[in-house]
Amino acid sequence: MLIAALESAFGTDNGLSQAPGFMESARFMQYMTAPGGDCFCFSDSPVEAECNMMMFWFAGKAKDLSLLWIERQYLDRPDMPFAEDRLLPSLMVFCSQLDLKNIGKPKKNFWFSRGDTPVFIYRGGWDSKEDTYLGVKGGSPSTSHAHMDAGSFIFERDGVRWAMDLGMQSYITLESKGVDLWNMSQNGQRWEVFRLSNIAHNTLTINGERHLVKSNAPITRTFESKKQKGAEVDLSSVFANSVKKVVRTVILDQKDHLEVTDRLETGDKEAAVSWIMVTPAEAKITGKNRMELTKDGQRMLLTVDADTEVEMKTWSNVPPHEYDFRNPGTIRVGFETVIPANRASQLKVRLIPLK
C-alpha cells in the first residue's frame, strides 16, 4: 500500500519495489496455496487461505495477470474471506487498471526459494482441486516465527491432504495462559507447545529429543522432471547431538507416488528414530511394515522399507497441556525403529493410492 501511494502521489517508489525478493513474493504466495484450497502452513502460518487484494497490485506492477489465477477463483466465492478486509476498497482501484477477462494460468509447476527458510513446491496443475501437490521445507527453528519442522512435507492427491501441518496456534491463547512463547532457546517453553514441537510435524524425532534450535537444514538438491519431483534436505545439523548424518529426500515418482527416504549414519551410540506424519485420514495397520489410510472415500497404502526392525504406530493428537489447541479429526502415523551404533541405515516410506 505504501508503494502504491508513493507511485500515485509522486510517480515513483524510489526503488522500494526493486528490493531483493519483493516482487517474487507474489508468486511465492501463489505457490503456497495448494489445489485443495488450504495453505502450505509451515511455521506460524494459518491453514486457511484468504483472498489477497495486494495480488492485484502485484499483477499490475509485474504486468503478469497469471498472478491472479487463484484470486480470480476466490472472487467467485461469496464465502471467501479477504486478508486485511479493511483495505478492500483498494481492490477496486487496482482492478480498474487491469483486463480481468484475460487471466491465464501460471506457466510453471515448480517453486524453489532458498534463503533462511528454503521451500520447494511442486503443483501438478492449476485447474482442479484433485491436482497433486508436494511441499518440502528446510530451515531452522531459530528463524522468525519458526517451528521445529525442518524436513517436513505436505502432500495432496486426489482431493485429499494426506500429509498435513496442524498450523499455528494464536499467540493470545498461549500468552494469556502464561506461556513464555518467545523464549526460543533450546530449553525454552515455546518448544513445549504441541503444535510447535517436532513431534507434531512430518519429520523425524531421534531419541525423543527436540530438534536443535541452532541448526540449519538446507535444501541441497531439487528434482524437477516428470520422473522425479521433489527435494533433498540435509538434516545433519538438526540432529548433531544424536547422529553423524541425516539426509531426507522427498519425491514424487512418475506416477505421483510419494517416496520419503531418510539416510542416517550413527556414531558410537544407537539412535531411536520416530518417523511421524500428521494426517486427517483414518489409519489401520494391515501387516508388517504396512498401514492403510482412508479419507473421503480414497485409500492410500503406506509401506516402510528398512534394514532394521520397524514397529508401525499411530499416535493421538490429543495434546499434553491445557493451553494447547485441540486437534480434532487428525492423528499421527508412522513407525519407530532403533539404528545400532556405527551404522549407515536407510528408511524408505512410500504412499501408494489404492483403488
Walk through the language-model features, giving the residues of each:
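CBM-like, beta-strand-rich accessory domains located in the C-terminal region of large
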Residues: 45, 73-81, 85, 173-355
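Catalytic-core segments of enzymes that bind and process phosphorylated/nucleotide-bearing substrates
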Residues: 156-158, 167-169, 290
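Short, acidic Gly/Pro/Ser/Thr-rich loop/turn segments
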Residues: 129, 143, 171, 211-213
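Active-site donor-binding loop signature of nucleotide-sugar glycosyltransferases
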Residues: 138, 166, 206
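Carbohydrate-active enzyme catalytic cores, enriched for enzymes
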Residues: 1-163, 224-228, 232-234, 330, ...
